[in-house]
């Protein structure tokens, strides 16, 4: 639907991906499970496409619930992954690529003071039409404010 995955998400592909992220050194992806207060897994988040030389990475977030962006946990998860990326890994730039049809995601990252860097016109085909993708980022110096 509105996921950026281009491969079918099934157990075999997920297992292969999970094994591959543990084989690269330094890692190009670092992922974490997201638990609710009852310790139930409700999603995953992490840093993907980590560019160690240029110190930047994409933030990935997948939740099992609809409208996760409106939940208080959404901001908490983004704040934690920013803290990890900027403070623990000493990255300079974290970014997200969001489909323009995912209006709640756009709203959330704007609210979190990510800066819109660009727009890739008609990059994806969903719901029988072309959609743009939007790039938002935050720099380490903006995070520390």
Question: Language-model features: where?
Answer:
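Acyl-donor (CoA/ACP) binding surface of acyl/acetyltransferases
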Residues: 31, 35-145
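A short helix-loop-beta-strand connector motif used in the catalytic cores of GNAT acetyltransferases and
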Residues: 19-33
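Conserved GNAT-fold acetyl-CoA-binding loop/helix
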Residues: 1-19
């Amino acid at each position: 639907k509105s996921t950026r995955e281009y491969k079918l998400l099934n157990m075999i592909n997920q297992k292969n991906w999970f094994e591959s992220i543990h084989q690269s050194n330094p890692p190009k992806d670092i992922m974490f499970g997201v638990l609710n207060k009852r310790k139930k897994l409700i999603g995953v988040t992490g840093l993907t496409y980590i560019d160690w030389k240029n110190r930047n990475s994409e933030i990935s977030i997948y939740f099992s619930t609809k409208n996760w962006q409106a939940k208080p946990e959404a901001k908490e998860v983004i704040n934690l992954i920013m803290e990890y990326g900027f403070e623990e890994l000493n990255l300079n730039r974290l970014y997200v690529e969001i489909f323009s049809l995912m209006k709640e995601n756009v709203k959330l990252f704007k609210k979190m003071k990510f800066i819109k860097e660009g727009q890739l016109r008609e990059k994806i085909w969903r719901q029988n039409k072309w959609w743009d993708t939007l790039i938002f980022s935050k720099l380490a110096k903006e995070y520390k404010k």
